[in-house]
């Protein structure tokens, strides 16, 4: 049995509960940060994670509290992150940086701290993962900083983070280390309320 703690900054993630199915998002108007990461209370996302070492592992992230514009997300390792939903986007007060920021258009960018920058590189990706097939997805790539790490996250409207990739090349050896998480299943808000097995779940290795 194996558990994997999720950390979105490094790539985290998964378990089957709700389901996605092949679908195009219902037209709900412009793509906004809130639609790309719908943080309704009780929502849960599960991911299959490839670490490059051993079999895939499972990771889970869920919204555990919503207080006004403040949202707390807890990962299966017990780590919590707090975000604020603002008019401009999704703000992380702990690091004083944006997770997602409007406008959602190719080339838009924002500072993510420690010399790193996030940039929107695509707004029309089609994604096929175990949770389903999704369209009009947005790719955000974060680069810079001393370690040269590149983090790419694909957000799909009315779904959330669907693919999370992190890769880094060792300066001395030139070897690349990579971690990739793909959405296995998800349930939003009331749909997830009846699911009570995510916290602290033990997952059997495939």
Per-region residue spans from a language model:
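Residue-level signal for mature regions of secreted extracellular proteins and peptides
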Residues: 12-13
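Conserved functional acidic sites
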Residues: 20-206
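Bacterial N-terminal signal peptides that target proteins for export
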Residues: 1-9
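C-terminal motif of bacterial Sec signal peptides marking the signal peptidase cleavage site
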Residues: 16-18
